């Protein structure tokens, strides 16, 4: 929580000191983290953009219901302006500094992935999985490999009505939000022909000053592009976080980017598309840590008075990592970039399913949906 306003700090990074074990707070500011017995003398390090880092000894924490407060950082604008030439040069500096900021070696990561689909306010699909990722450096065109370690799901196809609404890409959708590895997701080599850049604000990340670089598509470009903000460390010019939205003003054009196939007589278009990606500093370099997408679609039927609203969210947090060995994933659980994860994993039932693995603590609405699913599954088993 913010120490002054007591507001929740969402998507804050939580790391066990001296290790690569980590998680992230959810959209309600809550988190849980599983700590090995041999690390009980370590500390938790909580970081959040615009705040001083919080370090707390694990032994001082209760098993649950701890409340932690972070202090807002003080920004000294005058010291930064002297060193900033213009927004265009800042972005060029980001691109030219990628090697020193993000390294050139592959990394073996463990990640937790969750995706949900709601029909209006009701959850109709929930999928979660632990994945092993062979994360490739930005300097190679080689795509990441993802191995499904374990996962669970539930989908209520009755509530899905006549549309079998599914999210394609699974964990790859989250990885493709890595703007350092995949800059063409937003920025091509002609970025300055497509976007206007501006220096919007200056904040802090612990003791380091951070530039807030805003971007939006040029008004002369009619194709749906993105608008948003990048948060850039002023000393290294590393992107430490970014939030961005798709311009959905042209419904038909925006809809073409997402709809693979649809029934005859229905128009599908997005009403909101929002993405976020965070990076974490480890041993002087920044690595991919978390990403999230929130998308809302409207379905208009030719012969129906009312439309249908579907909302889908996906997120992935890196919970552990190490230097990668040279072996590629060779088993049958290797995922492809067009995977539909809800078709790949088993039913949601066991409340202790994740064991020792760290996950993103579910929001209250998701937690309630999980409990309902587990009760329903247990009732069905008892009837059988």
Regions found by a protein language model. Name each.
Residues 1-9:
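Structural motif
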Residues 66-196, 206-209, 259, 264-384:
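Surface-exposed, low-complexity/disordered segments
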Residues 183-234, 238-245:
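Extended beta-strand-rich segments in extracellular/periplasmic secretory proteins, especially
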Residues 33-41:
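Short Pro-Gly-centered beta-turn/loop motif in secreted/extracellular proteins
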Residues 20-30:
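Short, acidic Ser/Thr/Gly-rich low-complexity loop/linker segments typical of extracellular
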Residues 31-33, 64-66:
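Short strand-edge motifs at loop-to-beta-strand transitions and within beta-strands
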Residues 45-56:
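A short, solvent-exposed loop/turn motif at the edges and junctions
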